[in-house]
Amino acid sequence: LGHYAGIAGTGAAIEYLNRIDLAELQEHEVSLNRIITDGVAGISGVELIGPADAAARAGITALTVEGCDVHDLAIVLDEAGGVMVRSGYHCVNGWFQARNLMAGSLRTSVYLYNTEEECRHFTDIFSDAVNALS
């Protein structure tokens, strides 16, 4: 039997991507990523993984926080602020281990449906959570 749900889903995804302006999407992601990057820049112990320029990271921001367990931080962000992030190795265990980042990272991702307000909310809650846990 064919994988009809997968075929229909792929067709819907292609239609969706054809309707959006990818350059506009990229500009939006970078703009939101800059808000996050700037918002966490002054927090003691926070280190950005990857290029400093948000344009080189598109919609992804990965962070380590000295003295904080990223899994605990993710739970606090969710429970205290309704902010959903990922924590851990993000399917690249070897990359983290080769750099001795044994705790993994906290990762945010933004997309077309995210807003500047949501990104500012993240940076506020993130700052509070880091201060509470470190």
Ranges and model annotations:
Residues 1-134:
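Pyridoxal 5′-phosphate
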